[in-house]
Amino acid sequence: LDFAQEWYKEIWEEITEILLEAGKYAKQNEVRLSVHPGQYTVLASDKPNVVENSIKDLEYHSLYGSMMNLLPEDFSMNIHLQGLYGGTHDAGIKRFATHFPYLSDYAQKCLSVENEDKPNGYDITHTLELAQRIPIRCTLDTHHYDCHRMVETERVKVEGKYVNRKVREVDHITVTSDL
């Protein structure tokens, strides 16, 4: 991305070399790398400027995987669905699905969504519903699930057809400092 090259122009060559080396190491050691863009990356937003900035942020993060020469199955960008804003879950899911095609092909293939830790937020059933509409990976964050038990176990049913992206499953576990 042009803005990333501008920000880091003085060390761009060095960054490129380091990332290529990191990617080579990850492949040789079968390490799957992931990033977790921040809470302001909201593809389900109803605000055009937030969506535009979210797309830029996701493209910026996907640049790391690309510069490491990693295939999407070896690099993941994990975000929350978000974007409820007093509306319905379905409206947010529709907005996310509408904005998703504006991402580059590589960014789309690297992106995954996870359940949230907020009461009345998007739970794993909502992320699975999104995966019925668009080809996106879903992550169950056990920390968020355990904190709020927002989803009753019997409600979590994997039904329908999902895209098999030949991606190794990944556990996303958060451990707090008091454990």
Language-model-detected regions and their locations in the chain:
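A short alpha/beta connector and helix-capping loop motif
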Residues: 52-55, 133, 147-179
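Non-globular scaffolding segments
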Residues: 143-145
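Active-site acidic/histidine proton-transfer and metal-coordination neighborhood
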Residues: 11-137
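Glycine-rich, proline-tolerant flexible connector loops at the mouths of alpha/beta enzymes
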Residues: 1-11
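A short acidic (Asp/Glu
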Residues: 3-4, 44-46, 123-125, 148-152
